[in-house]
Amino acid sequence: MAKPDLSVEISGIKLRNPVMTASGTFGYGKEFSDYLDLEKIGAIITKGLSLRPKAGNPTPRIVETPGGMLNAIGLQNVGIDAFIGEKLPFLRTVDTPVIVNLYGNTLEEYGELAEKLDRLPEVAGLEVNISCPNVKQGGIVFGTDPNAAAEVVGLVRRSTSKPLIIKLSPNVTDVVRMADACVNAGADALSLINTLTGMAIDLQKRRPILANITGGLSGPAIKPVALRMVWQVSQAMAVPIIGIGGIMSATDALEFMLAGATAVQVGTANFLDPSAAQTIAAGIEDYLAKNGISDVKELIGALKI
């Protein structure tokens, strides 16, 4: 039997395999280049970018929890100008699609970022983090209100012709409603889920462990929630989905594909094993070969109910 076909496509972005790296867990790519072959994964998704450099939250801002971790990094990043001048030159040398994750605290910031990134041919697509507070509207999180989310997506859509992936928050009562609002406003694809809001407490000090009090929960603990949401959205609409949440192995990745994901993102696993994404991609190929499956796309949405 010939080698299985692992290639998939997300809104015109062709991936050699369905394994991407999750924003915020893989730096800007170069940081991990000594630990894995960047040309053996499907795509690199950068650390979230803002218009200006951001220092992030005070420490402590990471804490291990049963089955995962909480982080309150605060979207620390170098800013768009330093990314273009210092980070992008390396990414140009890698034959793997680069998707830039971006965020803003106002509609205008999202639009300006998208316009700047639209001019960069090296950027294959944009992933928009809408789990941010709108500082001009009382701090409401864009990604928890369908109307606010649609405003962001619509503005970014008008600001770029690049494939547009919207990263959905799980901190909502109806993820399908949020997904529908984003797709109707111009999203080409959806990635889900972002982290669940959680907290940890130091019993002896009677204080929160994180300086920020709350943080984003990721890792195996959130996988069942992520699987459920991916499945719900895939059943409700025909849109490419990228599954995220507790993917630590090829088995995890394949479960997300059965639930309806076209591709997956590996996040927390990168902290435990810097070569995790490549290992998972190889594991998917091994599964296909052992089970006589010629094309990974046969598994997308193949869950039997």
From Swiss-Prot:
EC annotation from Swiss-Prot or TrEMBL = 1.3.1.14
Q: How does this protein assemble?
A: Heterotetramer of 2 PyrK and 2 PyrD type B subunits.
Residues annotated to bind FMN? S23, K47, G48, N101, N129, K167, I193, G219, G245, G246, G267, T268
Record's NCBIfam families?
Answer: PRK07259.1, pyrD_sub1_fam
Offer one Pfam family short name for this entry: DHO_dh
Q: In which pathway does it act?
A: Pyrimidine metabolism; UMP biosynthesis via de novo pathway; orotate from (S)-dihydroorotate (NAD(+) route): step 1/1
Which GO BP terms, alphabetically?
A: 'de novo' pyrimidine nucleobase biosynthetic process; 'de novo' UMP biosynthetic process
Q: Which InterPro entries match?
A: Aldolase_TIM (IPR013785), DHO_dehydrogenase (IPR050074), DHOD_1B (IPR033888), Dihydroorotate_DH_1 (IPR024920), Dihydroorotate_DH_1_2 (IPR012135), Dihydroorotate_DH_cat (IPR005720), Dihydroorotate_DH_CS (IPR001295), Dihydroorotate_DH_I (IPR049622)
Q: Which residues form the active site?
A: C132 (nucleophile)
- Write down how the cofactor binds this protein: Binds 1 FMN per subunit.
Q: Which cofactor(s) does the record list? A: FMN
Is Disulfide bond tagged as a keyword? no
| Catalytic activity from the UniProt record | (S)-dihydroorotate + NAD(+) = orotate + NADH + H(+)
- Keywords from the named record: Cytoplasm, Flavoprotein, FMN, NAD, Oxidoreductase, Pyrimidine biosynthesis
CDD domains in the cross-refs:
DHOD_1B_like
The entry marks the following residues as binding substrate, namely K47, N71, A72, I73, G74, L75, N129, N194, T195
Q: What is the protein's known function?
A: Catalyzes the conversion of dihydroorotate to orotate with NAD(+) as electron acceptor.
The protein's GO terms of the molecular function aspect are: dihydroorotate dehydrogenase (NAD+) activity
Where does this protein chiefly localize? Answer: cytoplasm
The portions of this protein that span the membrane are none
What protein am I looking at?
Answer: Dihydroorotate dehydrogenase B (NAD(+)), catalytic subunit
The top EC class is: oxidoreductase
Q: Which family does it belong to?
A: Belongs to the dihydroorotate dehydrogenase family. Type 1 subfamily.
Location(s), subcellular:
Cytoplasm
